[in-house]
Regions:
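Hydrophobic/aromatic-rich alpha-helical bundle segments in the mid-to-C-terminal region
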Residues: 122-126, 130, 144-207
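Hydrophobic alpha-helical connector segments
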Residues: 62, 73-105, 157-161, 183, ...
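Short, basic, alpha-helical segments at the C-terminal edge of helix-turn-helix-like DNA-binding modules
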Residues: 65-70
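A ubiquitous short alpha-helical element
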Residues: 58-59, 91-98, 123-130
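Residues in soluble alpha-helical coiled-coils and helical-bundle/repeat scaffolds
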Residues: 54-58, 80-84, 116, 120, ...
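Amphipathic alpha-helical segments used for helix-helix packing
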Residues: 88, 100-122
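Helix-turn-helix
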Residues: 13-16, 20-58, 62
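N-terminal intrinsically disordered/low-complexity leader segments
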Residues: 1-12, 202-207
């Protein structure tokens, strides 16, 4: 560790600590975000991190919210790029089960476990789950209005879909079934929930 520390403003140091925490979480999950690990990542003494981030529970919660919030923004943009609700829903769900999202999947899975002992994290998780459910319900509602989907309660269906996504992504961490099989299983289930003909969503997957 350097014997001298570059002096930075409070805002700069806070941003640096936040960036380091996010980098650690993406590399090894939320459990890797510890005072000592963040300090090592930044290249400063743990006491300096503690000064600018006095609550590790808050830092972990904020790290989670930043990473999954970025993912939601990315997926919202993906949905907007599609011309129909059916195309948007199929693209979004396939993206969420893509193996390239393994780092965020681990963060989600650990958040439910760690949130049992970290109420700040638990609150962030609930907020993000609500945001994701609202987003999916919006896509479904657009499809219902356009006559593509048939359902009575888009919000309830969105919650059920998220439960399936979370479960299948958890399965992916131990390589149970391959990604294409998990995606087809999910889309076929959603087709039934939205009263669609078989393959309306599955048929939109790349061959």
């Amino acid at each position: 560790m350097p014997s001298t520390v570059t002096r930075r403003s409070a805002a700069e140091r806070t941003a640096q600590i936040s960036s380091a925490a996010q980098s650690l979480a993406r590399e090894a999950g939320l459990s890797a975000v510890t005072l000592r690990a963040v300090a090592t990542e930044v290249g400063v003494a743990p006491a300096l991190v503690a000064h600018y981030a006095p609550s590790m529970d808050t830092l972990v919660g904020d790290t989670f919210a930043a990473i999954v919030g970025d993912e939601l923004s990315e997926v919202e943009e993906l949905a907007r790029s599609r011309s129909t609700a059916s195309d948007a829903l199929a693209a979004v769900l396939a993206s969420l089960l893509d193996e390239g999202r393994a780092e965020v999947t681990l963060i989600w899975v650990q958040s439910w476990s760690l949130g049992g002992r970290n109420e700040t994290l638990a609150a962030r998780v609930r907020e993000q789950m609500d945001a994701w459910r609202t987003f999916l319900a919006g896509v479904i509602d657009v499809g219902r209005g356009a006559g593509e989907f048939r359902c009575d309660d888009p919000l309830a269906i969105a919650g059920q879909i998220l439960g399936m996504v979370d479960g299948l992504n958890a399965h992916s961490l131990v390589a149970w079934q391959d990604a294409s099989e998990r995606t087809r299983l999910l889309l076929r289930s959603v087709e039934a929930m939205l009263d669609l003909e078989p393959d309306v969503l599955v048929g939109r997957l790349p061959v």
